[in-house]
């Protein structure tokens, strides 16, 4: 069931702003950045009331030390399912992926390893490609992810490291993971390849990850693989 327009506008702004800043979002910031920019009517009291309703409905929560709100798992899921806009990745990463995939005549393992490193470097997330039929995976980027503020607490960093280990040991489980798996964010695309069978390209990180950017890059990489790898079978 969809939220009404005002709630969607505010939830969309909070998710995007929190992804970009890692700071809880106040009603004053919404009034300044969203309502003035889009010329929407609404007093700070009205905005606070809508935020409270989103909080009570489970889309937002209030961190103990802040007057602002941040998205919950439910809030992120609603954003991904209903509000996210996926366009083409920027030219730089498209060019990089094209060059990597064009080298499929070389050793496939080295190409997939380079692809995983490129995804991890661009997205700053634990990223890679796995092969479900073979039960193997190429994944990189854990050190970069652990620089995010969510992982400054050692126990959270350890949990995420364990999470990535579980990905390495359970490729089929990765293909079935939801966007908010185990308290972390996951973006993935499963596709079929003529030579390698069922494959999954993925990125994983904190829930406060850029889902639009990750989705656009992963979809482009999967399309690139299918287009270039399968054209010899066409």
What does each model-found stretch correspond to?
Residues 1-13:
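Short alpha-helical segments that sit at the start of domains
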Residues 2-3, 42, 71, 89:
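Alpha-helical hairpin
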Residues 10, 72, 203:
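Conserved RecA-like P-loop NTPase ATPase core
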Residues 14-18:
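Short helix-to-turn junction characteristic of helix-turn-helix DNA-binding domains
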Residues 2-3, 22-23, 108, 153:
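Residue-level marker of regulatory loop/turn positions in helix-turn-helix DNA-binding domains and
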Residues 11, 55-58, 197-198:
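Short acidic (Asp/Glu) and glycine-rich catalytic loops that position anionic groups and cofactors
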Residues 77, 84-234:
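Intrinsically disordered, acidic Ser/Thr/Pro-rich low-complexity regulatory segments
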Residues 20, 24-82:
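N-terminal helix-turn-helix
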């Amino acid at each position: 069931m969809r939220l009404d327009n005002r709630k969607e506008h505010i939830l969309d702004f909070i998710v995007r702003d929190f992804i970009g800043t890692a700071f809880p979002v106040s009603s004053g910031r919404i009034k300044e950045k969203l309502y003035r920019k889009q010329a929407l009517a609404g007093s700070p009291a009205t905005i606070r009331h809508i935020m409270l309703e989103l909080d009570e409905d489970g889309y937002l929560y209030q961190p103990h030390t802040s007057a602002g709100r941040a998205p919950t798992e439910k809030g992120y899921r609603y954003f991904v399912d209903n509000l996210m806009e996926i366009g083409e990745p920027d030219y730089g990463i498209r060019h990089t992926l094209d060059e990597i995939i064009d080298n499929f005549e070389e050793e496939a393992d080295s190409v997939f390893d380079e692809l995983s490193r490129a995804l991890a470097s661009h997205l700053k997330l634990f990223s890679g490609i796995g092969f479900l039929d073979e039960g193997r995976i190429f994944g990189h980027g854990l050190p970069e992810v652990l620089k995010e503020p969510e992982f400054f607490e050692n126990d959270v960093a350890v949990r995420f490291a364990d999470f990535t280990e579980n990905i390495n040991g359970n490729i089929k489980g990765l293909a079935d993971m939801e966007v908010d798996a185990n308290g972390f964010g996951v973006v993935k695309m499963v596709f079929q390849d003529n030579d390698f069978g069922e494959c999954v390209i993925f990125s994983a990180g904190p829930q406060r990850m850029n889902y639009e950017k990750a989705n656009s890059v992963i979809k482009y990489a999967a399309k690139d693989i299918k287009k270039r790898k399968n054209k010899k079978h066409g």
